[in-house]
């Protein structure tokens, strides 16, 4: 049975599912519909391109490579970490459809030992140029799925008011002596792009 989490919750995934070795982290959202003139015309969704990405940190919570933001990030322009232990499954340009809008696969057993945490975040592509923000998004969530059994382990619904914000840190996987924890976050920022978000973790 999946566990519904709130902001700041932490669970031990390895204890929840014995033998857990691979997870799929799914992130989803819906665009708020905008109504036509006087509400008389058919409503259409906002054309908002949200991008999910993973940030790779050391055991102190900093980027594993202080000299290259790209080498610390798995995203639409860098879909796979060398060796394939962390893979972005592709960019969804519209957020249309049910379920996960973007997914990031993690082979927990194969994640290099120098990685102490994997943070999952979402930003709006060209948000400032297009004058878009997360107040135009609804039903945002992050969930963790047992990849082998295809069963959901936990879910965090990002239900706060994020109006004016262009990036969210949804949660993260944290390596422990017992395996891996998942911790929710929910912090929001006014970021121009992915680099702005990743740079938060520079020393």
Language-model segments: what does each one mean?
Residues 1-203:
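Intrinsic-disorder/low-complexity signal
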């Amino acid at each position: 049975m999946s566990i519904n989490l709130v902001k700041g919750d932490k669970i031990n995934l390895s204890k929840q599912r014995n033998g857990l070795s691979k997870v799929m982290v799914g992130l989803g959202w819906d665009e708020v519909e905008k109504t036509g003139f006087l509400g008389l015309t058919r409503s259409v969704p906002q054309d908002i391109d949200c991008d999910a990405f993973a940030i790779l940190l050391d055991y102190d919570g900093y980027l594993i490579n202080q000299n290259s933001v790209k080498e610390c990030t798995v995203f639409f322009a860098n879909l796979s970490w060398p060796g394939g232990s962390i893979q972005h499954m592709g960019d969804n340009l519209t957020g249309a459809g049910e379920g996960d809008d973007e997914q990031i696969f993690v082979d927990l057993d194969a994640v290099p030992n120098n990685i102490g945490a994997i943070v999952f975040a979402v930003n709006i592509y060209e948000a400032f140029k297009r004058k878009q923000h997360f107040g135009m998004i609804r039903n945002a969530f992050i969930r963790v799925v047992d990849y082998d059994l295809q069963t959901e382990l936990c879910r965090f619904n990002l239900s706060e008011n994020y109006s004016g914000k262009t990036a969210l840190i949804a949660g993260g996987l944290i390596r422990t002596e017992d395996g891996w924890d998942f911790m929710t976050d929910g912090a929001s920022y006014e970021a121009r792009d992915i680099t702005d978000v990743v740079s938060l973790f520079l020393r």
